[in-house]
Amino acid sequence: MVLSSQLSVGMFISTKDGLYKVVSVSKVSGNKGDTFIKVSLQAAGSDVTVERNFKAGQEVKEAQFEPRNLEYLYLEEDKYLFLDLGNYDKIYIPKEIMKDNAMFLKAGVTVFALVHEGTVFSMELPHFLELMVAKTDFPGDSLSLSGGAKKALLETGVEVLVPPFVEIGDVIKVDTRTCEYIQRV
């Protein structure tokens, strides 16, 4: 438990209505001299934002997360199946949680996840992954437009710009944060 006056942006709190991320916090003085803490909250796993008022000094339940390493297995209908490397449980993660991270997934990739009461609320890919080039442009097709680079389609479906010497079948290192080529492996 934390006091309402200790709430800060980025914290997660648990209420009877669910789990929320604190988006903004401000102190408001009431008519009778009472001070309230006005908080904008974003429902975990969605874009829905609500506003709540807490009395100054009111206790609020801070959500506790368990860090977990999960290994990606495969896509099953509209959910991604992972293996928890700590206890070997299977965990399904919906597409809404995966967002843009899904385009880098291939079997065997280990991700870092934050879990609250058995539910994954966020996950992070390794900063760098090694992926195989499935298709590339011919060197002359895109060189003039991109300053010496050509387009390459990777095994997961991601398209990146690569140097002209990269060929189909090469394994390259990609920065998952920027979707940029780093080096040939």
UniProtKB/Swiss-Prot annotation:
Q: Which UniProt keywords apply?
A: Cytoplasm, Elongation factor, Protein biosynthesis
Q: Which SUPFAM superfamilies match?
A: Nucleic acid-binding proteins, Translation proteins SH3-like domain
Q: Which GO terms describe its molecular function?
A: translation elongation factor activity
Please verify whether the record's keywords include Protein biosynthesis.
Answer: yes
Q: Which Pfam families match?
A: EFP, EFP_N, Elong-fact-P_C
Q: Which SMART domains match?
A: EFP, Elong-fact-P_C
Q: Which GO terms describe its biological process?
A: peptide biosynthetic process
Instruction: Cite the InterPro entries for this sequence.
Output: Elong-fact-P_C, NA-bd_OB-fold, Rib_uL2_dom2, Transl_elong_fac_P/YeiP, Transl_elong_KOW-like, Transl_elong_P/YeiP_cen, Transl_elong_P/YeiP_CS, Transl_elongation_fac_P
Annotated CDD domains: S1_EF-P_repeat_2
Q: In which pathway does it act?
A: Protein biosynthesis; polypeptide chain elongation
Q: Give the Gene3D superfamilies listed for this entry.
A: 2.30.30.30, Nucleic acid-binding proteins
PROSITE patterns, per database record = EFP
**Entry's Gene Ontology cellular component terms:** cytoplasm
Q: Does the keyword Secreted belong to this entry? A: no
Q: Which NCBIfam families match?
A: PRK12426.1
Described purpose of this protein according to its UniProt entry:
Involved in peptide bond synthesis. Stimulates efficient translation and peptide-bond synthesis on native or reconstituted 70S ribosomes in vitro. Probably functions indirectly by altering the affinity of the ribosome for aminoacyl-tRNA, thus increasing their reactivity as acceptors for peptidyl transferase.
Q: What is this protein called?
A: Elongation factor P 1
Q: Which organism is it from?
A: Chlamydia trachomatis serovar D (strain ATCC VR-885 / DSM 19411 / UW-3/Cx)
Q: Which gene encodes it?
A: efp1
